[in-house]
């Protein structure tokens, strides 16, 4: 409860606006991410074990992380990201999607089983989550519909998730089921716990101030990988972007933002994989082509590269703070089940276009219906399955570490995917790796 919804809204609005104005790749959307949440949770537990105040420790870890991140930016360390290939990018992207899905399903189950929620509230929570997911997915697919005008289909596809939240919340308000868990926000512009906005940096002993540099090194690895891998996914050739990337500038901006956010104990922001890819897709012109087997395949023709949408999104997020007190007095609070449905939507839809996920589907697909992709045509199926199995093993290890007491060193295990990929050169031919991992 020390860092809540209000802190996340403020951090996202301020950080996202600054990033949209100053970054080298404004199509990337900043936000809180699953791996960063895991790291913060483990840092909280570590502070409890050492009997240290969490907010002061959080601030110092953030400040040290900012220093290390800025050093990475000014020394050109982002060039090291060239050693990351599609192998690492895809495993990381699927991990983020699974975190969204597992958090949505797990929290929804906890809500349904909560003793303070009666059977009507449990049933309504389940219905609201499913309805939010279904509406968002349905509206997202209207872009390919034959009905309505083009601009209407485009609007519904781009704002489908917002419409889904509003519709499901309206139903919850209309039914007025008491005891339904809702998003906790203050009645006024204030922190969730009522603490001062500015953190007391000197509430720590000297040894802890310098000791915070150790977890900050791990956090820096996470920020570096999380942000740069997402930027690579945004800049991938399939998106046909015309303007060049700005890895060093982007990392510098994130480092400076981390320092500022840490002073107020606001959530650290990095490139949000799911939101960034959805942002690119919303700005893309997409065409469908018919494959020889009769199936269809989508491909991006162009993307409207600009700063306006990212800037507008975060300004509107900031303005939403002004309406929160009024909405709360009117009883128009967002049920948590609606947000779980949104998380499920974000996790499921972000799997689209991920070749690792598409190759996993081949395991349960009739061989006669395999898609005619380049790797299916050029690589023996046995080797495709072997490559996919290695990626799956890496994903499973990352998940186990995330759920274990080793979660604080979780960033190092993500980094180990890079040498793992280079070790595959001994087991696969170069042309096979070119097809599977180019």
Regions found by a protein language model. Give the residues of each.
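Transmembrane helical cores of multi-pass ion-transport proteins
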Residues: 1-438
């Amino acid at each position: 409860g020390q860092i809540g919804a209000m802190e996340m809204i403020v951090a996202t609005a301020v950080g996202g606006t600054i990033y949209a104005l100053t970054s080298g790749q404004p199509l990337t959307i900043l936000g809180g991410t699953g791996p960063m949440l895991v790291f913060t949770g483990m840092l909280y537990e570590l502070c409890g074990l050492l009997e240290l105040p969490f907010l002061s420790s959080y601030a110092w870890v953030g400040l040290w992380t900012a220093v290390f991140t800025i050093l990475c930016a000014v020394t050109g360390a982002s060039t090291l990201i060239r050693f990351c290939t599609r192998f690492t990018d895809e495993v990381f992207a699927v991990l983020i999607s699974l975190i969204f899905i597992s958090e949505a399903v797990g929290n929804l189950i906890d809500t349904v089983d909560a003793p303070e929620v009666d059977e009507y509230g449990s049933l309504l929570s389940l219905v609201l989550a499913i309805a939010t997911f279904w509406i968002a997915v349905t509206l997202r697919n209207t872009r390919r519909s034959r009905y309505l005008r083009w601009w209407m289909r485009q609007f519904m596809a781009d704002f489908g998730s917002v419409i889904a939240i509003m519709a499901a919340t309206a139903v919850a308000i209309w039914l007025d089921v008491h005891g339904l868990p809702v998003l906790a926000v203050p009645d006024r512009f204030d922190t969730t716990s009522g603490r001062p906005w500015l953190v007391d940096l000197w509430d720590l002993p000297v040894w802890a101030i310098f000791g915070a540099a150790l977890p900050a090194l791990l956090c820096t690895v996470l920020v570096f990988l999380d942000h740069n891998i997402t930027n690579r996914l945004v800049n991938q050739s399939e998106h046909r972007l015309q303007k060049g990337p700005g890895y060093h500038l982007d990392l510098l901006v994130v480092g400076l933002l981390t320092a500022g956010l840490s002073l107020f104990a606001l959530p650290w922001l990095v490139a949000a994989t799911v939101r960034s890819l959805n942002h690119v897709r919303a700005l893309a012109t997409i065409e469908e082509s018919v494959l020889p087997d009769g199936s269809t395949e989508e491909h991006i023709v162009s993307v409207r590269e600009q700063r306006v949408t990212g800037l507008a999104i975060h300004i509107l997020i900031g303005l939403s703070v002004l309406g929160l007190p009024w909405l709360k007095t009117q009883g128009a609070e967002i049920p948590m089940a609606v947000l779980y449905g949104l998380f499920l939507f974000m996790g499921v839809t972000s799997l689209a276009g991920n070749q690792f996920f598409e190759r996993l589907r081949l395991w349960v697909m009739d061989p006669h219906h395999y898609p005619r992709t380049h790797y299916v045509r050029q690589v023996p199926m046995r080797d495709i399955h072997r490559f996919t199995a290695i990626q799956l093993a890496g994903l499973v290890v990352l998940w186990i570490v995330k759920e274990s007491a080793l979660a604080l060193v979780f960033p190092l295990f993500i980094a180990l995917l890079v040498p793992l990929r280079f070790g595959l050169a001994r087991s696969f031919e170069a042309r096979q790796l070119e097809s599977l991992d180019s």
